[in-house]
Amino acid sequence: MAIQVVTTEQSTLFTIRTKHTTYQMKADEYGVLLHLWYGASVEGDMSYLLDYPDVGFSGNLYEAENRRTYSLNTLPLEYATEGVGDFRIPAIAATHADGSNALDLRYQSYNILKGKYAIAGLPAVYADEDEAETLEIVLKDTATDLQVTLRYGVLPELDMLTRCVSIQNLGTTPITLTKAASFCLDLPYGKWEWMHFHGRHAMERITERTPLIHGIQESSSTRGTSSHHQNPTAILCTPDCTETNGSCFGAAFLYSGSFQTKIEYDQMRQARMVMGLHPDLFRWELQPNATFDTPEVLFTYSDSGLETLSHRFQKTIREHVCRGKYQKIERPVLINNWEATYFDFNEEKILKIAEEAARLGVDMLVLDDGWFGKRDDDCSGLGDWFVNEQKLKGGLGTLVQKVKALGMRFGIWFEPEMISEDSDLYRTHPDWAIQIPGRNPMRSRYQLLLDLSNPDVQDYLYKCISDILNSADISYVKWDMNRSISDWYTALLPANRQGELPHRYVLGVYALLERLTSAFPEVLFEGCSGGGGRFDAGMLYYCPQIWCSDDTDAYERTIIQYGTSFFYPVSAVGSHVSVVPNHQTGRVTPIETRAVTAMAGSFGYELDLNLLSDEEKEAVTQQIQQFKEYGSLIHNGTYYRLSNPLEDAYALWAFVSEDKKEVLVQGMIFRTEANMVRHCVSLRGLDAKAVYRTKDGAAYTGDTLMHAGVLLPKSWGDYYPVSMHFVSE
């Protein structure tokens, strides 16, 4: 069994084992649940690591009497509270009926279950019953009837753990939750560095690594979504940690709304990481006999560097978070009309793009923003999900039939969560928009938010979208979300419960997505929020791929996709070849380089193919053929980062098949210099004894490629593409 429990008169010891890790905690003689160990596999009781120093201004547990060395302020706690002597970051906070806010959680019982728990209404890692176990540890406040159940999901073969928390009010008066984190991890004395992934619109998930300093560091979003600006993931690592060496802990929040990751480096040089819902946008009235479930955190530990950490997250998210028909299969090569036409199109213009795309081998045409309502710019029409027949004279069905006659499938864009003030929907239901009575709402992109916590809004959107999907043979939906959320208010809740809206909004989005993906299992849903503004594991539970960024510049995409790869699989990355000069940067890169970068994702085109030269069109045909040849390797192979594009003169990555018989190395050399020395790069993950051959007949042993490396091609011009394919005999 992956979970072992040893009970004595004085304590209960919990040990969770995966293939290469051990996680251990103990309910001690006072019922305090202490964290003992998370790291490489070890045997025995790790309680000997507990230190009980006598530290001034660190108060002592009442039951400890004269034992001045027992302090919640210095001990490693499994789920930290506030108001009872631990002055570090709490994981949970609540206000009781009498106005007090102390919580003193003590151990009550445990339960071990076969299989992996699920969370009603929320995304969660899933597994077959024989692939996982669940540990539940029940804690209870000493003075009230608040009960907390810590849930641990264990996937031993994947070396992955999950955590979530259920909070139940067993009393007779409401309790107000003001913080309910999903994850709390205390790490022992030592030097630690923090990796997080910051950014902005059109430049998401830039890797940043800094030493922990005394005090509190934070990455978070209060935008109602996980945001472009910080990603709901974090890594703590030792200073010597590299891709292949050193210790590191990683955590990913399966949630698409506002979040907070806080890390405190305390007076004892211990680190505490707390991850969960952002408390600034959370206040939940927990009624008697009601239960609140937090979202889930997925986490792991590696003692062999960041590469192993990433491989575990990528595999788990690809195979145990993403769902449905498109979970593992290669995605269709698509052409999106957005950067080719923006709002200015009609059926003739769209068909002209489709005809050329079909001739070159593209699988699917996606019609982006502007096909519905009164939508000639971004000032109107959102919410009116009916076809604009001034643009599409024969309606959507006629266009889809014509596209299908070309041998292509058809996809369509929606922005369901938004409403324009200049729309029939707003004129009929202004009360459905999120806005505060008596205040002018903040507009963003000239649009407001629909209140997705409202079941009537969910039903309206479900009917609109399902009517469109049923009206024609549609194979793909791009689900966009183009603003941050402000002006939080809903008429559905009383004043003292308005703090529930941000979380209820996300639950509403999930409920609508669950209904639609269940009703249309053959449709590929792609998430989007102005690119990568909601690129998180929670959204991947419903949409197996997400548009990675609105920045389609090939050079900058290497940086964005590099940061994305630390947690997310390549199969989840929406990535296209776009026009040059690039619409975001003005940069000109070769079409071969743009294709290589886009192949490290779903692959497609976002331009007017009719405007390409004959030479470029021939390149497109070859690129599509190449992607279809390598698609399974790219989406299901093991991904290796072979450079850091923020530091190196090139971006390089590799895909290695599970049986290690096939390797694809791709990337770009950023700059070319006269008499330039060629770069030599070592590969990883190969069969050391196998002989690998390229298409031109060159042969190398695996250990040669991994130790001596391979020379990159001689570059000619900046942003020079690299693509090398090796197959073992």
Label each region the model flagged.
Residues 20, 165, 289, 335, ...:
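Conserved, mostly hydrophobic/aromatic
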Residues 671-729:
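C-terminal beta-sandwich/jelly-roll accessory domains of carbohydrate-active enzymes
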Residues 5-7, 11-19, 23, 33-264, ...:
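Polysaccharide-binding surfaces and accessory modules of carbohydrate-active proteins
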Residues 326-463, 476:
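Aromatic-lined carbohydrate-binding/catalytic grooves of carbohydrate-active enzymes
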Residues 20, 243, 644-687:
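Carbohydrate-binding surface patches
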Residues 102-107, 284-303, 720-727:
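Short Pro-Gly-centered flexible turn/kink motifs
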Residues 393-395, 427-429, 433-590, 602, ...:
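Active-site neighborhood of glycoside hydrolase catalytic domains
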Residues 71-116, 243-258, 301-325, 362-367, ...:
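Glycine-rich, aromatic-flanked loop segments that form ligand/cofactor-binding clefts
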